[in-house]
Structures are given as C-alpha cells and as structure tokens.
Regions:
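Charged, cofactor-coupling segments
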Residues: 1-97
Length: 97
C-alpha cells in the first residue's frame, strides 16, 4: 500500500509549511517479545529537503541522523543518474548538516 505522508504546520492568517513524501508499507523486522508481525514505512519520494529552510540547531541528534541518512540515500540513488551541474547541485543539497 502506498500512502502520502504530509506533516505540516499552519499559522492562521500568516503562513504554512508542509513536507510531503510518498511512503510504502513494508514488513518490518520482528521486535524482541513481539507476538505479531509488524509493518513499517519506506520512503519512495527521493528529493532533498531545502537546506535554507532547516534550522539544524532546533533538531535533535536523532533527527539530524535521520535527515543525513535520508539525504545520503537521495544522493546514492539519484546521483548515478545525473551528471555535471545537476550532480554538483545534488551533492551540495545532500551534504551532511
């Protein structure tokens, strides 16, 4: 099953921001003590988040690790399909925070 994950924040009369990715439901690794099969999500949409809109000082260490890992995946999967200026942009856009 494919879903749209759309976390957002809207301030009435001022502005709004929303991040949107498509995700697919996949079987997950069993957890210790788990009695039933579990599922998790895998991100399908691979595009870097705009670094100009990220305040890294407001993110936890775990959030920074997730974002850097996501950007590494974007770079690893999209990078081989592009070259030249596009690759240079992608490498800059997905560099670790």
């Amino acid at each position: 099953m494919i879903l749209s994950n759309e976390p957002g924040y809207y301030r009435t009369g001022h502005y709004g921001i929303r991040l949107e990715n498509l995700i697919v439901v996949r079987p997950a690794e069993p957890i210790p003590g788990g009695e039933i099969a579990m599922h998790g999500f895998e991100t399908l949409t691979l595009a870097p988040f705009d670094r100009r809109l990220i305040r890294a000082d407001l993110l936890t260490a775990a959030e920074l690790r997730w974002l850097d890992a996501y950007h590494a995946r974007v770079r690893d999967e999209i990078g081989p399909m592009v070259g030249g200026e596009v690759l240079a942009w992608l490498e800059a856009a997905t560099a670790p925070l």
